[in-house]
A protein has these predicted regions:
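Sequence/structural signature of beta-propeller domains
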Residues: 3-243
Length: 243
């Protein structure tokens, strides 16, 4: 909201409202906005006054300034130096008004690897060996208020990422914090984008750049060239997903 925030020509040094709107990141830097760990998808819960945003990762957090010259010190919303795993921030605007300048926030989940680390790199309390992941990217609430999380991260299964598997899609209950893995993608892919059929009996999921390092021939296998695609997932009994 241009008129209600500090983003104007006086505070930013930009020459016009148009420049403030076009060069928003530069304008935000001028007024000292909080730097975030690579924001990706944002989703709003249709059943609850909350919005979530994926902060995918940030190898420079607490190490050096970003390309715009902003400091990227460790802080409450970006709590880890050299953030390898990412986190999801959640906020609730005052009076259920998304144009409000006041809101409450927390970290819904901090991704990590409890098999490798026993410090804050193990992740938040709702991360365990069965649902651990890194680099949350895609994000969507369904009509029931369930949060779907998709990843675009490190699939090496070595070092800090030992045992984390391929990129994946998980489902979360933002009331309880519980997170479960729903599906795992093929080797060397990003799982990105999802939508549901109107009857919620099918979920469509994007599989991007499988075999990008020549480690997979998905979806045709054999010696065929790997290709991005959309997959459709249904239950064997034909009922709604997750009922």
């Amino acid at each position: 909201m241009y008129k209600r925030q500090l983003l104007d020509t006086q505070t930013t040094g930009l020459s016009s409202k148009a420049e403030v709107c076009i060069f928003t990141r530069l304008a935000a830097s001028k007024v000292g906005a909080t730097t975030m760990d690579r924001p990706e998808w944002i989703a709003s819960n249709p059943k609850k006054n909350e919005v979530c945003c994926c902060l995918t990762n940030n190898k420079n957090r607490g190490i050096k300034t970003n390309k715009g010259g902003d400091k990227v010190d460790v802080d409450k919303v970006n709590p880890r130096k050299n953030n390898k795993y990412g986190q999801i921030v959640r906020w609730s605007p005052q009076d259920n008004n998304h144009s409000s300048v006041y809101f409450e926030w927390d970290l819904f989940v901090v991704a990590g690897n409890p098999d490798v680390h026993d410090d804050n790199n193990k992740g938040s309390k709702n991360i365990n060996e069965d649902n651990m992941f890194n680099s949350p990217d895609g994000l969507k609430f369904d009509k029931y208020g369930r949060l779907w999380i998709q990843t675009d991260g490190n699939y090496s299964n070595s070092g800090d990422f030992k045992g984390m598997g391929n990129n994946q899609m998980l489902i979360a209950d933002t009331n309880t914090g519980k997170i479960k893995r729903f599906m795992v993608g093929p080797k060397e892919c990003e799982v990105t984008g999802l939508t549901f059929a109107p009857d919620y009996k099918t979920v469509f999921v994007g599989i991007q750049h499988p075999g990008e390092r020549l480690g997979s021939n998905f979806p045709d296998n054999g010696n065929n060239k790997p290709r991005s695609c959309i997959i459709a997932i249904q239950k064997k009994d034909g009922s709604e997903i997750l009922t």
